């Protein structure tokens, strides 16, 4: 998936060994741990061992969606910049981010909304959210909009990667995804980092972990 030298591979493997040793016991299944371990590798922050929540069907659903060439809808361009375009091309997956579109900016100003909310609404208007992987790494309002669309319009993404970072609504936006079951909503697979921590780097790490897991399974 990546152009990496033997030395680079050795350094990465050594890093993973250190993480495994220092992380100690955990309750994650093997494939789930490969996701969490890659998050820790990207951040050098072992807190993610405790704050990462992975839905029981998240890995399978994410890999199957990739195999089908699902749309990948992101809240910020930084996520797109971090993804491996060649690997996504193998799967036929297209990436989308509308946050800098002129109409999104104008609608946000006119409605006194946020660009993140309007970008998600635009994605929904193009029917890009059903059977998609939705990746939110920066904007809590985008994740809250996804939660609302699930409840009110019944959208069914294949996987939500909900890891927005921040002090305003980041914690609450992630909790809203967990609470969907209380609205008698069919459970949507998710990977979340609870609390304030998260970010685009985390989102990219999760997507790359899923791509690697898919390769290990022989899906591509």
Curated annotation (Swiss-Prot):
It comes from Leptospira interrogans serogroup Icterohaemorrhagiae serovar Lai (strain 56601). InterPro entries: Cbl_synth_CobH/CbiC, CobH/CbiC_sf. One of its GO terms (molecular function) is cobalt-precorrin-8 methylmutase activity. Belongs to the CobH/CbiC family. PANTHER family: COBALT-PRECORRIN-8 METHYLMUTASE (PTHR43588:SF1). It is an enzyme of class 5 (isomerase). It catalyses: Co-precorrin-8X = cob(II)yrinate. Homodimer. One of its GO terms (biological process) is cobalamin biosynthetic process. Its EC number is 5.4.99.60. Keywords: Cobalamin biosynthesis, Isomerase. Catalyzes the conversion of cobalt-precorrin-8 to cobyrinate. Pathway: Cofactor biosynthesis; adenosylcobalamin biosynthesis; cob(II)yrinate a,c-diamide from sirohydrochlorin (anaerobic route): step 9/10. This is Cobalt-precorrin-8 methylmutase. The active site is at residue 41. Substrate binds at residues 15, 38. Pfam families: CbiC (PF02570).
